[in-house]
Amino acid sequence: MAAACSLLHPPALHAQTAEQGHLPEIAVKGPRDASIGTADSASEGAAEKASFQSRPKLRPGDIVEAVPGVVATQHSGDGKANQYFLRGFNLDHGTDFAMRVAGMPVNMPTHGHGQGFADLNFLIPELVSGVRYRKGPYFADSGDFSLAGSASLDYVSVLDSPFAEFTLGQNGLRRLLAAGSRTVDDQTWLGAVELEGNDGPWQVPEHLRKTNAVLRYSQGSASRGLSVTAMAYQSRWTSTDQIPQRLVDSGELSRFGSLNPTDGGRTRRLSLSASWFDKGPEGDTELSAYAIDYRFGLFSDFTYFLANPAQGDQFEQTDRRRIYGAQATHRRPNRIGGLDGILSVGAEWRGDRIGEVGLYPSQFRQRLGTVRNDKVSEDQIALHAQQLVELGANVRSYVGLRGTWLGYDVQGREPVYGALNSGRGHQSLLSPKAGLAWTVAPAHELYLNAGQGFHSNDVRGATIRLDPQTGLPAERVPALVKGTGSELGWRFQPDERLSLTVAVWQLQLGSELVYVGDAGTTEPGRASKRHGVESTLRWQIDGRWRVEADLAWSRARFRGASPDGEGNFVDNAVERVAAAGVVWQQGPWMATLRLRYMGPRALDTLDSVRSRPVTLLNFGGTYAVNRQLTLGLQVFNLAGRKGNDIEYFYASCTASEVLSDRCGGGIADRHVHPMEPRSVRLSARWTF
């Protein structure tokens, strides 16, 4: 019954007194660590605090690279969501990888820029208490966008001591973070404020201006408690989008140059969330609710003068919405046919009230017309249940079922096609899950998991009739797209210092039909299949040294017959990812070195053009001068490599190519956004 006891063990959040010469640390115990006797799969886990807090982070979203196999890059300004890669998916800005922060979903359905848009720039990494992750559609409580995986992040509720930290870096980087907490009896208030500015290495300065604040109230004990969290975030920036490789090769444009200095954006996010839990020998109950007010505006230009040789191809995307949601879960021990078990049940609701989601052609940030302007109401309701059973002393299994209902109402406000592309509808599906774990020896455990999951599509694609740019009939997409996956895994864990996992997985999607926010129309895709192998190593060698290593290989192909002129490669699907890190800590010193490799990938369905591999090496270190002052150093791209954060292959046309009549129907080329050159950041933290 070890698994049952672990499932019902209450979380404990407590501060530990920092040793002299060390940074204040928050010790956090999750409700269930992924270990032998408690884990449900080989690919689930919890990132060690020493791992994600010590690693150098160029951007807040880099923290998700603590999830093995995940790569987070950027192809535009630092106020925009990262580009994510995992398990053979180019996840764009979040499709098929679900993220939650403080119990609130981050992914945005029917978003102005792209489905599943997951912007983590409001995150304050220093406050993160834990990163828990899962891979695959194997769990009943995992819903939309979680086909490839999911990650859940939370903030601490208490700090050892208040602190202020100032960071200064190259290219105009400056950042101020102040945070503290106060506890009276069983009630704690925590607050943090972050201010950041950055110009970046770009020829057109980024002029990033970011303001961020967190206020959390918590009270109670380890067995019963309440927390309320308020967050406020806003930023604005000028972005350097991807540029044609041909201009870089000819010397016409710097790697860090821009073809449109008016690209950029702004975003604002206000949220209020609350959670309550009650844990005891008879069961656990958790309730949570949230409300989010969100504003987003983005100006982009990817093809320059291809579609509109006179005024250019810049476009504006907008999103203005309020999000409401709530969820309830209950877990209790039970007996099934004389066998010990745990029954978990839950209910979820999310409602997006989108006042405006729009796409507009623009020039110098001035609108020239309207492609789409819609008001959307979207609700998703889910019920789920999962039964865990101890089949014997060394074998446990679970079966689960998730029922999801999606309802939507699209009201088009574009004067020509808006009414025709309006509509309402709903779709539902059932997603079965199952898993088996066998402890074959005290240090070895095998896992078998299978299940169905889904991701939602932009619901504008479910009501569309006519392409708003051409007036031609457009193909509708299903609101929910089903995927089926399975996984076989092994975990070796002789003690708490060493953990090694291997997972072999496969995932099939019935269709990759998507609504393309950049075009305002739908793009039909084909059924696909992915499979791969992942391995992770976590080894605390002794009190000073810690080593981590991750390897991931995947193969992604479209299924079925290929249309004329196309192949079966899923374009932009990363095939090989490797990461390694070493952390050394002794006395007042701490140092870490982290390496990330992202292998080449097909940039078209024929695999005729491939991206170049990218290797990135980062360094971070701190020195605690005394109990109050800690100095820090971060060096990004330590080796000074000239790789690309992102590569695409498509046709574009520049102004000079239009004037010289060289454009024709566009020039197919790589379009790249370089990773940042070597840069140094210095920080000083004063603990009060």
Residue ranges of model-derived segments:
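Transmembrane beta-barrel wall of Gram-negative outer-membrane proteins
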Residues: 168-197, 202-240, 262-284, 332-333, ...
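Short acidic/polar hinge/loop motifs at secondary-structure boundaries
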Residues: 105-135, 154, 477
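Gram-negative outer-membrane beta-barrel transporters
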Residues: 330-332, 393, 406, 499-509, ...
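C-terminal beta-signal and adjacent terminal beta-strands/loops
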Residues: 454, 600-602, 623-688
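Membrane-embedded beta-barrel scaffold of Gram-negative outer-membrane proteins
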Residues: 275-277, 284-302, 439, 445-455, ...
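Face-selective signature of the C-terminal outer-membrane beta-barrel domain
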Residues: 225-233, 265-415, 437-439, 494, ...
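N-terminal periplasmic "start-of-domain" segments of outer-membrane beta-barrel proteins
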Residues: 24-61, 78-83
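Extracytoplasmic beta-strand/coil segments of soluble accessory domains associated
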Residues: 61-108
